[in-house]
A protein has these predicted regions:
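Short, hydrophobic alpha-helical packing/hinge segments within bilobed ligand-binding/sensory domains
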Residues: 43, 106-109, 125, 163, ...
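Mature extracytoplasmic/periplasmic domains
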Residues: 154-214
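Ligand-binding "clamshell"
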Residues: 13-16, 127-139, 201-204
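Extracytoplasmic ligand-binding site segments that recognize negatively charged/polar headgroups
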Residues: 1-114
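Solvent-exposed loop/turn segments at secondary-structure junctions
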Residues: 27, 34-37, 53, 61-65, ...
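A ligand-binding cleft/hinge motif common to bilobed small-molecule-binding domains
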Residues: 111, 117-134
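Conserved C-terminal helix/tail region of periplasmic/extracytoplasmic solute-binding proteins
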Residues: 211-276
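Periplasmic-binding protein-like
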Residues: 84-93, 131-157
């Protein structure tokens, strides 16, 4: 009863038979106001030559392709091979300006001023901004991905009654409030949003007003053929260009280690022979 209606009956569980919404998140741009001119309003800034070597991109195929797809006006759940290849070409075009493809590394890099701009999840950007007051956050005008983390009971659960009690416990107003404060993600729980003690209830990163609320799309599960296509294109993207040099360096390093090892073995063998 505490769950806001718009987060019920989602595409992956139309009648909420199997899941209960727990957290809500969206992807946006976190940027350093001392390094970026003005307020960005488009994903296109992540392709801007002006910020070459200062852009952090998701090291996550679905999110990375999603950004390119939003920028190109392509459905993020498309099954068209041509659409996925268009997004791939857009990501290839971006690669020369990317400093690094990151996930958790984004925290140290953005908080430490090592990069100017990154795409990441709104809830995590709250912590970044607390650790570096020069950081700001915005949702691009082209739209973005929204996701709802949900709680489920596994099919093989041996104590279904206890599992249901635990879920009800998590949905309780005071417990849901503690979770929302700790995790810093948006909550789908009305009891939390109505609580004046909730410190993030007016946070624009989590709850943007109507004017700043972006167009959103949920990532649906891709069919196996489309998933294989995306994975293949992503692998191709990562091994091209600068990453090829990394592969060469790795191979050379390995070869040097092998040579040094055999030289060491040879010297050691000769020393042993000289003792007899």
């Amino acid at each position: 009863k505490n769950i806001i209606p718009k987060y019920k009956d989602l595409y992956f569980d139309p009648n909420n038979e199997y899941s209960v919404p727990y957290n809500v998140g969206m992807v946006g741009l976190v940027y350093n106001t001392k390094m970026v001119e003005g307020t960005p309003d488009s994903w296109s800034i992540m392709w801007d030559e002006k910020y070459k070597g200062q852009v952090l991109m998701f090291n996550n195929s679905r999110d990375a392709f999603g950004i390119a797809q939003f920028l190109l006006g392509i459905d993020v759940n498309t099954t068209s091979e041509q659409d996925w290849k268009k997004a791939y070409e857009k990501l290839k075009e971006q690669k020369p300006v990317v400093q690094s493809y990151v996930m958790d590394d984004v925290f140290n890099k953005m908080e430490g001023g090592e990069a100017a701009i990154a795409a990441y999840y709104a809830g995590d950007c709250i912590g970044m901004a607390e650790n570096n007051p020069d950081l700001a956050f915005v949702y691009p005008k082209e739209g973005t991905n929204i996701f709802v983390d949900s709680i489920c009971i596994p099919k093989g659960c041996q104590n279904k009654d206890a599992a249901e009690l635990y879920i009800n416990f998590l949905l309780r107003g005071d417990i849901a409030l503690a979770n929302a404060e700790c995790l810093c993600y948006a909550t789908p729980n009305r009891a939390v949003l109505d609580n004046e003690e909730y410190s993030l209830r007016d946070n624009e990163m989590l709850y943007p007003d109507e004017e700043h609320t972006p167009t959103t799309e949920y990532f649906h599960n891709l069919d196996s053929e489309t998933l294989m296509l995306m994975t293949s294109l992503w692998d191709n993207l990562k091994i091209e260009g600068n990453d090829v040099m990394s592969v060469y360096i790795g191979l050379i390093t390995f070869a040097v280690i092998v040579v040094v090892y055999f030289i060491y073995r040879t010297i050691r063998k000769k020393k042993r022979e000289s003792m007899y």
